């Protein structure tokens, strides 16, 4: 069932690299748990910092974190004081030296994680879910996305019975492995309960060799061919008849 497949996991090792990059002989569960705790702490600590995802690289004595964010100034702070404070906090948690790199996301409207977070914040502020979803879709298409799908599930609008609503525009291929699909899901905690928000953004097709090393932001994208217009309306059929009549 293609619609049930996680687009990120399906493309790992093909066109998508890993967010955790390290090697361990026998301590893998503990390190994996520490990675999860680091990501949860950073998401809570930088809730207003526009944090999309965290790439973790490890050496025996050092941890390198790359924070992909749309608001680097909020994370770095004036004169770098905020990022130094964050580094000291993470050092106490991990008992290792921590190096933090901040990478700016130029187009947050095309980042699935940031789009989902934005919709979740609007739902928590009691904005209409339809308005939030349609605004996000129009912004992504305007910024160059080939297709986008957004799904919200829960007690939408305070309804007694939970339901699922989704909006889609453009192409969102689920089984094309060369399709660059950015996927994320988040949760909006409203007064009526939790609402799940899932976002799929199709950015284009990647052709050729792909560099799967960490922190590679630029990817080679193949522009998809424009769809050919097929069929036609009443006016099109009438114009074809007129052309045939003139030729006769």
Tell me the role of every PLM-derived stretch.
Residues 1-248:
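RNA-contacting regions in translation and RNA-metabolism proteins
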